[in-house]
Amino acid sequence: MDAIRRIDYSELVDVPKLQALMESFSEVLGLPNAVMNIDGKIIASAGWQSACTNFHRVNPETCARCLQSDTSLAESMTRGARYAIYRCLNGLIDAAAPIMVEGQHVANVFAGQFLTEAPDLEFFRKQARQFGFDETDYVAAISKIPVMP
């Protein structure tokens, strides 16, 4: 019996053109986005929030939360969900949908980080203190996250 060859999405697409598409998408909609393979490797991304790039993804504890949240969304896709919306463990919202090729789940497209209501600044101030972030800078970064009711 022949093993089914796992499709590598990054071999199927022109990655620089995909990157340009993701940048345009982010600019038009005002939302960060990414395409990740099923192993969680980022193929293309644009518009990430400074709360994530300057705080969450650089602190070991909050970065672990990011990875756990990404994994939870990706697992929803492997269980056959058409899409998933998830509040990450750092308090932000991400959405994802699977990319299928010839019936095989090969990657996920993510939109986010965003909020569905004005940020709970006390929650984020507490989080800043908990993880040693500069509270003023962190709250300023959180305040820039798009709200999509």
Predicted regions, residues:
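Sensory/regulatory domains in signal-transduction proteins
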Residues: 68-129, 147-148
